Structures are given as C-alpha cells and as structure tokens.
C-alpha cells in the first residue's frame, strides 16, 4: 500500500501543468510534459516556469516550507487539512479614482505581492521605485517575472528531498542538515523602512532617552538625536548612491542595520535579479538568491538541476553531473566513455547530433560528422574534401585556395562567377 501511495504521489507531480502551452515556444511546443528526472518539458526543453502553468498554491507551499522552523513563521499559516505550511504573502489592492466625462470610475490595481508593512503609502512608494516591468501587478509582465524568479531563485529541490530524483538515505540526511544550516545561518527576509527610522542597532523605538531626568531634558535629548539623524548621509550598499531620507529603503538583518539598499538594488550578487519577495541569503558580505547561495556551497548537476550530495560525480565542460545524469540531452543515452558534442552547453551523443544538429554540406548535401574537418563561411559549411569544397562552375578543388563566395556557392575566379550569373 505504501509503494502504491508513493507511485501515485510521483505521478501527480508529473501531471501538474500537463499540456500547458509554452509562453516561449508558442505553437512549436505540444504542451508541457515534465521529463522524468530533468526539470524541463520533454517536448520543447523549456522549464515549467516558461509554461502557462498556474502554480500559486504550489509556490506558496514551497515558500511556506522554506520559512518553516525559522524566525519567519509569522509569514506562514498551516492548513488545517494536512498541516502543510503555506506562505502568507501580502497582496496589496490599490484603488485610484479615474475622472471620466460623466462620472468618476474606480481603477483597481492588484499587486500579487507587496512588502508586509502596515504603512500602505510606504508599500506603494516601494513599488514605484521598482522598474515597471518588474512590478508584480496581477496579469502583467511584472507578475510573470515574479513567477519565473520564484521558480528560478527558490527551487523546491534545493530544500525538499522528496522533490529530488532517487536520493540515497545518506544523501537525504546530508541534504536535511544542509537545509537546516542555511536556514539558521543565511536565510533572511528584507525589511522596508525609512532610513531615518533605523540606526546601526536596528529599528529605533519611540522612546524618551534619559528616563531618570526631567521631562524637559529628555525631550531635548530626543530632539538632538532627531537632528543628528537628519544630518546623516545615507547611501545604498549596492550602487553607493545617496538615498533620500523620505524614500523607502531595504534592510537585511543578517547584513547588519548599518547597510541599506534601494528597492531596485536589492538583488542577487550573482544573477543581479531582484530578490523575489525580498527573500535573501547572506554570505561573505554579499546578498544571494537561494539558487546561487546553494551553488556557492554545493556542486549542482547540470542534468537534473539538483545539488549534488554524493562524493562521486562527473566534471565535464566546466560543469558538474551526477554519474547517472551525464547523458545525451536529446535521448538520455549515458555518455560515459562515449563521443559527444556540446550543443548550447548541453552534451549530445553522436547519432543525435548528426540527426538533429549537424550542419549540412553545401557540396554533397549530407550532414557533416562532428569528427570530420569542415570549411565554414558565414552560415554555409562544406566537407573539407576534394569531393565537396569545389568551384560551383568548373569543379576545381578550393582547399587552400582563394575563393569567391556567393550565397551558398563558391567560385575560383571572376570568370567562373560570371558564367554562373
């Protein structure tokens, strides 16, 4: 019965989003179909985030699990039905009156995520300081951008062993320890406040210093401290540019409250993308998204996109691979000890290369074997042989000779070119 349940769960994972159209490939993709162990579509090779798949609940579960057993449990709620932690993302709805000729209509804007601050004006300011194409307005390019970054920056398989492919019990234990470590030492969520509300010790509470002195002296001390803060020059930790005192700033607790960022500068130090929902990882005085923090700690398999917890793995083409995942990108044939060709940074076996990727010789019109020498000019190629690289008029061999190219033809002389024109 347990085995049946496990198989059913695995099947449900592969049914999610099945048949959804690809937003990148359009009609070229037959619809989303998840590869058995790669995190891509079997039909078009794009990721799930490139397809029109409704993932809001799944993403909320993923982020909820990330915050479980951390100080950020206030951002999650457990469902009564199954106890799964769900991310309580802050949705902001703004209503703006729009003047029309006869009456006034109401224009409503919904942000699929907004910083969880009580001051809605501050949240609105924060959104306005982001590039328009990255503002998560429902149904917009910005909402699609947020969806992609949730998938890219916070892969479920970087925190949940059940989302990985065939981990051994030892690897599961190592992964659980790794996740616990980064939750305790690196994970954080940015905080939006005005620069004048903070100092190097953290948020400034509203208090009157010198409680044992007279009220007048205490008020004077408070005014002096306020005046000092107004003179303070605030600059962004990322771009080093100055910050206006009345503009929202982002603070990262793990970085220390002496550092602050412009909203548009709160980015991963590796991919330079906005840190989705201000979720960051702090290491060596730098901000990282979840993916690139994990990459700085563990090798990642270029085949399945999972972190490698095994001591034995393959290194090829400046990438890392699980031993069983160094396979042809087209047919999944294991490439250990085999001839392969790299196509767009993906290894492809020789038969698949010849069938799907090889260039065609302009002379014999056959595919050019990857191990055979060729002559290439612009987008045209020839076998580097006396049978193929010939003058298109007189059939003189042109290897090592000067030639005149005309589209897919080559000529040995002006005379031959004129005869064919």
UniProtKB/Swiss-Prot annotation:
The keyword Metal-binding applies. Residues 92-199 form the PET domain. It holds the Pfam family LIM. Residues 155-164 have a biased composition (Basic and acidic residues). Its main location: cytoplasm. Scaffold protein that may play a role in cell adhesion, cell spreading and in the reorganization of the actin cytoskeleton. Plays a role in the regulation of cell proliferation. May act as a tumor suppressor. The N-terminal and the C-terminal halves of the protein can associate with each other, thereby hindering interactions with ZYX. Belongs to the prickle / espinas / testin family. This is Testin. It comes from Microcebus murinus (Gray mouse lemur). The lineage of its organism: Eukaryota, Metazoa, Chordata, Craniata, Vertebrata.
């Amino acid at each position: 019965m347990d085995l049946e349940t496990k198989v059913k769960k695995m099947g449900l994972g592969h049914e999610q989003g099945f048949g959804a159209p690809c937003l990148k490939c359009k009609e070229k993709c037959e619809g989303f179909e998840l590869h058995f162990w790669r995190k891509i579509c079997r039909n078009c090779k794009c990721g799930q985030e490139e397809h029109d798949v409704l993932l809001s609940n799944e993403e909320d579960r993923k982020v909820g699990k990330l915050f479980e057993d951390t100080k950020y449990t206030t951002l999650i709620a457990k469902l009564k039905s199954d106890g799964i932690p769900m991310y309580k993302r802050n949705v902001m709805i703004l209503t703006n009156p729009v003047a029309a000729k006869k009456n006034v209509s109401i224009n409503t804007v919904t942000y699929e995520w907004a910083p969880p601050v009580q001051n809605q004006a501050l949240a609105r300011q924060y959104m306005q300081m982001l590039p328009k194409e990255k503002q998560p307005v429902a149904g917009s390019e910005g909402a699609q951008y947020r969806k992609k970054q949730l998938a890219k920056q916070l892969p479920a398989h970087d925190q949940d062993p059940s989302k990985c492919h065939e981990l051994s019990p030892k690897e599961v234990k190592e992964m659980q320890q790794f996740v616990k470590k980064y939750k305790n030492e690196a994970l954080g969520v940015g905080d939006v406040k005005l620069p004048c509300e903070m100092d190097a010790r953290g948020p400034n509470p509203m208090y009157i210093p010198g409680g044992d002195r007279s009220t007048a002296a205490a008020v004077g001390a408070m005014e002096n401290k306020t005046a000092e803060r107004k003179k303070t020059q605030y600059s962004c930790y990322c771009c080093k540019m100055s910050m206006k005192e009345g503009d929202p700033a982002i603070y990262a607790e793990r970085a220390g409250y002496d550092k602050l960022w412009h909203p548009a500068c709160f980015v991963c130090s590796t991919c330079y993308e906005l840190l989705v929902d201000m979720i960051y990882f702090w290491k060596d005085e730098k901000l990282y998204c979840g993916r690139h923090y994990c990459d700085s700690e563990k090798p990642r398999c270029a085949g399945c996109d999972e972190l490698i917890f095994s001591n034995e793995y393959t290194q090829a083409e400046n990438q890392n691979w699980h031993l069983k995942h160094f396979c042809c990108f087209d047919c999944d044939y294991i490439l250990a000890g085999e001839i392969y060709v790299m196509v767009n940074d993906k290894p492809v076996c020789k038969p698949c290369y010849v069938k799907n990727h090889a260039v065609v010789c302009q002379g014999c019109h056959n595919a050019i074997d990857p191990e055979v020498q060729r002559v290439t000019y612009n987008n045209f190629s020839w076998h580097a042989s006396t049978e193929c690289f010939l003058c298109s008029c007189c059939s003189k061999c042109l290897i090592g000779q000067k030639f005149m190219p005309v589209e897919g033809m080559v000529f040995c002389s002006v005379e031959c070119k004129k005869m064919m024109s």
